[in-house]
């Protein structure tokens, strides 16, 4: 195991490819399909230009001029950040709005973070967490009123627990 924890492995499926493209668009400023293709290859996903073009079209990805003049792919309003805007800060602001009204408690337990919500809200909270690329978080499992956030190690769970609590308290 590396110092940063286990790497995310994806099956060779269309859904996994679309998920990888979505994550790449959320975490990088992608200016060309060849740049996106290289990022996908680094993740072990080989894709033809034609398939990549169809995938981007299906995702409604469009090239948008950013504030600095760069033309990059974006998907909806939660896509690539413009110059001076950190994707992490924007993601935190979105998460804070959701978590503020829905999180009732947060606790770290081993490599897990346990997040309690009102009845029926856990699935929504988990999906908000899953949509953000959060370092050290592998994924979530949600029940009716509890979300388990699976982290790469115990220390990450403690730091992510504190972070989620601070977002919920804003």
UniProtKB/Swiss-Prot annotation:
Subcellular location: Cytoplasm
Protein's GO biological process: L-arginine biosynthetic process; protein complex oligomerization; regulation of arginine biosynthetic process
Keyword vocabulary terms for this entry: Amino-acid biosynthesis, Arginine biosynthesis, Cytoplasm, DNA-binding, Repressor, Transcription, Transcription regulation
Family: Belongs to the ArgR family.
RNA-binding in keyword set: no
SUPFAM superfamilies documented for this protein: C-terminal domain of arginine repressor, Winged helix' DNA-binding domain
CC terms in the record's Gene Ontology section: cytoplasm
Name this protein carries in UniProt: Arginine repressor
Gene that specifies this protein: argR
Pathway(s) annotated for this protein in UniProt: Amino-acid biosynthesis; L-arginine biosynthesis [regulation]
NCBIfam families in UniProt: argR_whole
Record function comment: Regulates arginine biosynthesis genes.
Pfam family, one: Arg_repressor
MF GO annotations: arginine binding; DNA binding; DNA-binding transcription factor activity
Lineage: Bacteria, Bacillati, Actinomycetota, Actinomycetes, Bifidobacteriales
Coiled coil: none
Predominant location: cytoplasm
């Amino acid at each position: 195991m590396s110092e940063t924890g286990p790497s995310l492995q994806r099956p060779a499926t269309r859904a996994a490819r679309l998920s990888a493209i979505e994550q790449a668009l959320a975490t990088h400023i992608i200016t060309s399909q060849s740049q996106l293709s290289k990022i996908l290859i680094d993740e072990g996903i080989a894709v033809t230009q034609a398939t990549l073009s169809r995938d981007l079209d299906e995702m409604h990805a469009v090239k948008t001029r950013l504030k600095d003049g760069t033309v990059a792919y974006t998907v909806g309003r939660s896509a690539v950040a413009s110059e001076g805007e950190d994707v992490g800060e924007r993601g935190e602001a979105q998460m804070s709005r959701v978590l503020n009204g829905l999180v009732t408690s947060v606790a770290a337990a081993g490599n897990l973070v346990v997040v309690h919500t009102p009845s029926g809200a856990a699935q929504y909270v988990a999906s908000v967490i899953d949509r953000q690329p959060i370092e050290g978080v592998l994924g979530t499992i949600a029940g009716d009123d509890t979300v388990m956030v699976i982290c790469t190690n115990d220390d990450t769970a403690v730091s992510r627990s504190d972070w989620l609590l601070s977002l919920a308290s804003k």
